[in-house]
């Protein structure tokens, strides 16, 4: 009886996820829907400055800066690199990339200052960039916040600005397509995107009538005046999941938009499982608000949603097997659009229960790291709330 009840509950969960959560699993919110059909060209193109925080990004910075300076944007566009105390020549490589394109005049490099207490490193670098922009005689209408490990197709900025102006948006974000080269990436990356969309249904984010908010930190175009009106980045200074925090901050003031894209790609490789593990462990517990009760609830929810269906289908027998099998089948159906977006077979969906178990383990490890004062580890810093030190000893 208990087994049948658990299997039936898991089936109801998957029916809800497929039908009642913004149809997130279909991945319909794409960048090609950003600009409404028939939208005319802008009579005046707003001024834009890209702010790129970078800390020891020698492997990717040249490609990132090069792709930004190669944008076909008709208006005035400049790039500000905030070098967050890099020791690997990040700034020099950025200059070389700009020089190769004859665009040194459109690249400015700001040397970041020491990270103060209460701030995460990325947000402190972004804030320094914003302060520098505000001190200029001619300030931009939009700021494009870009990670240093992102590359852009030439038309991305034009699309972002046209969409923002046509729809009256104050934040437009595109989720960079992650790598799927290594075995670890092929098995874990699509699930990461799937889980993110489940937590933050893009259709709900894009609906001004809903409170759900989020963004993808690699590529975020923000109206400068709205950011100032919202209180600036200081309002979210300690947020590990800074993109979603910024999305929530801006949505309280004006509409926002988030979409999948293949025009913005991540340059950061995750060659093995340990690399992806570190990425998830860094911020998973922050997603739960550093709450032990939420952690317990999340673990139980993951077990019920992802492990109970195959467990009942394969091992329970009797009346529990059918609802378990149906729930597992719906799980595969829901995961298939994400797998296809990443060019993978729907058969990978059969392994989603095991992949979910791995991510659950990462989440528990994230909580354990936080309890030991090692939360939010990134680029030699421990940045989570309660971390025992900002810099690694």
What are these regions (language model features)?
Residues 26, 30-35, 57-70:
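Short, well-formed alpha-helical segments that are part of the catalytic scaffolds
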Residues 126, 143:
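Short aromatic/hydrophobic "clamp" motif used to bind/position activated sugar donors
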Residues 164-198, 225-228, 233-295, 376, ...:
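Catalytic donor/gating beta->alpha subdomain of glycosyltransferases that bind UDP-sugars
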Residues 294-374:
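Membrane-embedded multi-pass helical conduit in multi-pass membrane proteins
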